[in-house]
């Protein structure tokens, strides 16, 4: 009985422990559900971010292709404009050459007419005015000396002009050197771009390898998660079975407790009955003794009866009858007591057998509860292992995603820095070129002013000579007037050509400045538009993420543990290539973007940067070509003007 009571007490303690374990297990399952919901929302958010980034990179690629197409169209348009300008310059040069040839013919004609007039005048005056001719000859010789002196001065001016031409040639050489330097710089830039592109390709290859490895590791982790999910399902089912069995065991324990109470009551009744029977036995023992004495007396009475019968005594019959009645009563009491004793013995045997059966059942229940407790401990240990594995997998996944985010941020920062450096270097180059162009234009303007001053001096000298000739000879004066008119006409044409050259130079400078301003403005506008588009996309993405999170929270509140695991597995199965591709910009579809471009996808940032650098290099190369062509045109025009001045003089 004491062993039975101890077993029941142990069962009570086991039930309390089982209740506490069930509460802890339910709390643990709730925590696991919350953690899985949180991680699922994080994974969904990350997959959506990777998808949006992939779409953004594809749109950027399309924009870059459209930009390249527009640049090609602009290049074709500029080429057509260049061809038209070359045709116009050729037409102008032919016109100027025709005008110069006309001027030369007119000068030759005037010289011939002047010589004819002079010869005619000399012939007519030769005979009549010999002395005057002599004086005139002497005067003319003096004038010839003066003209020789002036010719020496003109020779000096010619030397000065030659020096100016040498200076212009030196300027041309310096400009050629500058162009070569620009070409060398562009070649160096091209090499640097090629090196950066090679480095970017190597980085892309490394990233693609890392992403492939990450994909393999993610696949392995997905398989591990599948096995863990199966194990967790088995553990949950085992836990449910254990809970059901614990409920059944509780019911059995409750029934056993009731049976125990009933058995205790029956035992108490049986013990009381045994005690009463023992008391009755003790009470009936003297009666038995008395019955035995009565039997002995009965025997003695029988013997007495026999004797009386023998003796024929009738007076003792009444006593014998009384003794017989007493004996019958004592026999009945003895039989009743024996029956009660046998009943009590049978009841005691049945109670002892029931107690043995209950002890065996309690022992079996204790063993069953011990097994259930061990299973519960195993389930708890398996749950802990699963939690550890899940936390480790989450940490590794989080570390991988953090690394990918860091790489993407570094690539974007490098792209922005490269854009800033390229824009600053391009602006500095343009400023230098514009400054050099302005200095050259100022030098040309100074040279033009010097030539104008020289022409003004020549005009004054011609006026003075014409006045002297008018005072002496009318024919010579008329010829000089004609020459002066021709000279004035040539000066007007020279001024017109100078004005045209200045207008052309101003127009070219304004075109260059407008082109620089328009290109810089276009670049700034494009960058601002791209930034606005990125900001709008980020806002839209944040709104979509908020709505998605709200929907996910509403959907996850009514989902069970098994549905959560299945959804997480599906999301991983669909989202793992994106997360792998997302730094591949971040994973495999992006890697298809870098090779097609694919990465964060094959680092789309490097592909866009390389294309942007190639476009900037093309633009700089085209601008250098245009500047070289403009410089060559200005040099040719300056040479033409110098030749025109020398021929006119």
Curated annotation (Swiss-Prot):
The gene is cep63-a. Belongs to the CEP63 family. Pfam families: CEP63. The lineage of its organism: Eukaryota, Metazoa, Chordata, Craniata, Vertebrata. It is found in: Cytoplasm, Cytoskeleton, Microtubule organizing center, Centrosome, Centriole; Cytoplasm, Cytoskeleton, Microtubule organizing center, Centrosome. The modification Phosphoserine is found at residue 560. One of its GO terms (cellular component) is cytoplasm. Required for normal spindle assembly. Plays a key role in mother-centriole-dependent centriole duplication. Plays a role in DNA damage response. Following DNA damage, such as double-strand breaks (DSBs), is removed from centrosomes; this leads to the inactivation of spindle assembly and delay in mitotic progression. Residues 19-185, 222-556, 612-645 form a coiled coil. Its main location: cytoplasm. The keyword Oxidoreductase does not apply. GO terms for biological process: cell division; centriole replication; de novo centriole assembly involved in multi-ciliated epithelial cell differentiation; DNA damage checkpoint signaling; signal transduction in response to DNA damage; spindle assembly. InterPro entries: Cep63/Deup1_N. Phosphorylation at Ser-560 by atm and atr promotes its delocalization from the centrosome and impairs its ability to promote centrosome dependent spindle assembly. It comes from the Eukaryota. This is Centrosomal protein of 63 kDa-A. Keywords: Cell cycle, Cell division, Coiled coil, Cytoplasm, Cytoskeleton, DNA damage, Mitosis, Phosphoprotein.
């Amino acid at each position: 009985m004491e062993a039975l009571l101890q077993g029941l007490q142990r069962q009570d303690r086991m039930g309390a422990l089982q209740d506490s374990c069930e509460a802890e297990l339910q709390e643990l399952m709730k925590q696991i559900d919350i953690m899985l919901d949180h991680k699922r929302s994080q994974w969904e958010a990350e997959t959506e971010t990777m998808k949006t980034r992939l779409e953004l990179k594809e749109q950027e690629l399309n924009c870059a292709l459209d930009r390249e197409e527009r640049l090609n169209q602009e290049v074709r348009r500029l080429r057509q404009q260049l061809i038209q300008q070359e045709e116009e310059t050729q037409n102008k040069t032919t016109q100027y050459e025709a005008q110069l040839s006309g001027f030369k013919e007119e000068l030759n004609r005037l010289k011939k007419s002047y010589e004819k007039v002079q010869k005619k005048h000399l012939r007519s005056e030769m005979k009549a005015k010999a002395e005057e001719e002599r004086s005139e000859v002497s005067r003319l010789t003096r004038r010839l000396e003066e003209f020789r002196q002036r010719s020496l001065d003109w020779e000096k001016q010619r030397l000065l002009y030659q020096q100016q031409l040498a200076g212009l040639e030196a300027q041309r050489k310096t400009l050629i050197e500058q162009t070569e330097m620009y070409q060398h710089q562009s070649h160096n830039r091209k090499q640097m771009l090629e090196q950066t592109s090679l480095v970017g390709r190597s980085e892309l290859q490394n990233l693609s390898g890392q992403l492939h490895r990450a994909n393999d590791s993610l696949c392995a982790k997905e398989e591990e998660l599948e096995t863990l999910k199966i194990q967790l399902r088995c553990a949950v089912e085992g836990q449910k079975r254990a809970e059901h069995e614990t409920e059944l065991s509780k019911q059995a324990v409750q029934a056993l407790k009731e049976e125990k109470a009933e058995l205790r009551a029956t035992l108490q009744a049986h013990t009381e009955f045994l005690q009463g029977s023992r008391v009755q036995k003790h009470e009936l023992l003297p009666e038995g003794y008395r019955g035995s004495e009565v039997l002995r007396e009965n025997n003695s009475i029988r013997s007495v009866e026999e004797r009386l019968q023998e003796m024929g005594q009738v007076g003792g019959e009444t006593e014998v009858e009384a003794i017989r009645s007493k004996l019958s009563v004592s026999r009945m009491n003895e039989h009743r007591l024996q029956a009660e004793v046998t009943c009590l013995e049978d009841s005691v045997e049945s109670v002892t057998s029931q107690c043995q059966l209950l002890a065996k059942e309690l022992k079996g229940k204790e063993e069953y509860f011990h097994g259930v407790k061990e299973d519960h401990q195993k389930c708890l240990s398996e749950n802990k292992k699963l939690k550890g594995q899940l936390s480790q997998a989450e940490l590794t996944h989080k570390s991988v995603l953090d690394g990918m985010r860091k790489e993407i941020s570094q690539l974007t920062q490098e792209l922005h820095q490269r854009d800033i450096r390229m824009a600053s270097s391009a602006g500095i180059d343009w400023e230098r070129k514009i400054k050099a162009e302005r200095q050259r234009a100022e030098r040309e303007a100074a040279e033009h002013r010097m030539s104008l001053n020289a022409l003004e001096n020549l005009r004054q000298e011609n006026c003075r000579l014409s006045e002297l000739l008018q005072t002496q000879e009318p024919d010579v004066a008329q010829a000089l007037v004609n020459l002066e008119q021709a000279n004035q006409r040539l000066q007007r044409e020279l001024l017109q050509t100078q004005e045209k050259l200045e207008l052309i130079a101003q127009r070219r400078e304004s075109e260059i400045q407008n082109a620089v301003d328009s290109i810089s403005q276009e670049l700034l506008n494009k960058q601002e538009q791209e930034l606005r588009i990125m900001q709008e996309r980020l806002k839209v993405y944040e709104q979509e993420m908020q709505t998605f999170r709200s929907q996910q929270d509403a959907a996850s509140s009514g989902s069970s543990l098994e549905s959560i695991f299945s959804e997480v597995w599906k999301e991983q199965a669909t989202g793992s290539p994106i997360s792998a591709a997302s730094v591949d910009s971040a994973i495999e579809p992006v890697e298809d973007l870098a090779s097609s471009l694919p990465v964060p996808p094959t680092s789309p940032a490097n592909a866009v940067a390389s294309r942007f650098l190639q476009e900037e290099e093309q633009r700089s190369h085209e601008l250098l070509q245009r500047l070289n062509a403009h410089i060559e045109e200005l040099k040719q025009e300056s040479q033409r003007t110098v030749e025109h001045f020398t021929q006119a003089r």
